[in-house]
Amino acid sequence: MAGGAMKRYAIVIEEAGANLAAYVPDLPGCVATGESADEVERLIREAIELHLEGLVEDGLPIPEPSSRVEYIEVNAET
């Protein structure tokens, strides 16, 4: 995808035992795990690039990023 149009995909990073896991809501099946935030972010970036390259090789469309990330504040007192 070098030289192609840049797209900005939302990622979700969750704790997974002793590691972190990341996935891309707009790219089902595109996941990565790592031992640190830096590692999992690097690995999910690589996974996204490989996923998109595979779609292009298979003649499939590249999904447009459509997921939004918002945080909602709630009263958590019990």
Indicate where each model-derived feature is located.
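Short, charged, surface-exposed hinge/linker loops at domain edges
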Residues: M1-A10, R42-T78
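Beta-strand secondary-structure signal
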Residues: A10-V12, A21
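Short beta-strand micro-motifs enriched in acidic
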Residues: E14-A16
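Amphipathic, hydrophobic secondary-structure cores in small proteins
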Residues: A18-L55
